[in-house]
Amino acid sequence: MTTKRKPYVRPMTSTWWKKLPFYRFYMLREGTAVPAVWFSIELIFALFALKNGPEAWAGFVDFLQNPVIVIINLITLTAALLHTKTWFELAPKAANIIVKDEKMGPEPIIKSLWAVTVVATIVILFVALYW
């Protein structure tokens, strides 16, 4: 059965998400995928440069020393840290840890995740720089 009644469709602008801070932050957090793609492409180029010998690697290092690339990589690092922060804040909501019949708060989980991240970073830097 068809009807001739026209349903009401509420108008919505394409910038509706800019009105609420929650949605603005959500879009910013989801936008961290773009710098992650940049870093992935950069890493692939690094692997090819490493495979093609010392001259190609030296060219890649020269590319990385370009001030524009340094700024883009700093933006990428900032985006990765923001994504990590929001992910670590989400982790306690997925884990129900009960100690002595009480649910553990999110702070110990978040702090332990950051501690593991810092330790892993220090170990990787030590191996990369001094091994």
UniProtKB/Swiss-Prot annotation:
<dbReference type="GO" id="GO:0005886">
    <property type="term" value="C:plasma membrane"/>
</dbReference>
<dbReference type="GO" id="GO:0045283">
    <property type="term" value="C:fumarate reductase complex"/>
</dbReference>
<protein>
    <recommendedName>
        <fullName>Fumarate reductase subunit C</fullName>
    </recommendedName>
</protein>
<feature type="transmembrane region" description="Helical">
    <location>
        <begin position="57"/>
        <end position="77"/>
    </location>
</feature>
<keyword id="KW-0472">Membrane</keyword>
<comment type="similarity">
    <text>Belongs to the FrdC family.</text>
</comment>
<dbReference type="InterPro" id="IPR034804">
    <property type="entry name" value="SQR/QFR_C/D"/>
</dbReference>
<keyword id="KW-0997">Cell inner membrane</keyword>
<dbReference type="InterPro" id="IPR003510">
    <property type="entry name" value="Fumarate_red_C"/>
</dbReference>
<feature type="transmembrane region" description="Helical">
    <location>
        <begin position="30"/>
        <end position="50"/>
    </location>
</feature>
<keyword id="KW-0812">Transmembrane</keyword>
<comment type="subunit">
    <text>Part of an enzyme complex containing four subunits: a flavoprotein (FrdA), an iron-sulfur protein (FrdB), and two hydrophobic anchor proteins (FrdC and FrdD).</text>
</comment>
<keyword id="KW-1003">Cell membrane</keyword>
<dbReference type="GO" id="GO:0000104">
    <property type="term" value="F:succinate dehydrogenase activity"/>
</dbReference>
<comment type="function">
    <text>Two distinct, membrane-bound, FAD-containing enzymes are responsible for the catalysis of fumarate and succinate interconversion; fumarate reductase is used in anaerobic growth, and succinate dehydrogenase is used in aerobic growth. Anchors the catalytic components of the fumarate reductase complex to the cell inner membrane, binds quinones.</text>
</comment>
<feature type="transmembrane region" description="Helical">
    <location>
        <begin position="109"/>
        <end position="129"/>
    </location>
</feature>
<keyword id="KW-1133">Transmembrane helix</keyword>
<dbReference type="Pfam" id="PF02300">
    <property type="entry name" value="Fumarate_red_C"/>
</dbReference>
